[in-house]
Amino acid sequence: MYLYLIFILLLAGSFLEIFDSKRQGTAQIIYYLTLSILFLLSFLRWERGTDWSGYYDYFSNIYDLDFSNNFENGFIFLNYCIHYLFNSYTVLLFILAAIQYFFISKAIRYLSIYPVLSLLCYFSVTKGGIFFVRQYIALAILMYSIRYVIEKKIYMFLFAVIIA
């Protein structure tokens, strides 16, 4: 139900953004409000998503840096560090969500003249990244890295692609 409400909020914000130039401030409020709601939902969720238990079990049982499994090295390293420092899966979800939404919001603000509409498109394709997986983080970094192509900073773009 809440996904429908978020969709309606984004849809209304998109109409304001495109068709009512006097309400640009309202559209910005809707953009940041929706982004904040999606961010909160993405790391406060518990036992949601088809592969939640697999990720949770991996996090709970990581005691050394073993790069021989099917996860990316950066993801393994991040899991290990968060497990070692905080031993809290919620902290891991918070950090993953922060990475994802930082890069998504920066990319949308840089690339789009209609940020609410862009967030609506992102939400429609990924359910807002609420049930995020590693590929959404990579997608967010890649979307952000498009700015380096525009600015002709090829080495920064390649670095971002490698990180993603």
Residue ranges of predicted features:
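Short hydrophobic/aromatic helix or loop-helix immediately within or flanking a transmembrane segment
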Residues: 53-87
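Membrane-interface alpha helices of multi-pass inner-membrane proteins
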Residues: 125, 155-164
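Membrane-embedded helix bundles of polyisoprenyl
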Residues: 115-143
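Loop-to-helix entry region of an early transmembrane alpha helix in multi-pass inner-membrane enzymes
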Residues: 73, 85-102
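Extracytoplasmic loop-helix module adjacent to an early transmembrane segment
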Residues: 28-34, 43-66
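Transmembrane-helix signature of polytopic, membrane-embedded enzymes
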Residues: 24-25, 104-123
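Membrane-interface transmembrane helices that cradle and orient dolichyl/undecaprenyl
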Residues: 142-156
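Start-transfer (signal-anchor) and selected internal transmembrane alpha helices
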Residues: 1-38
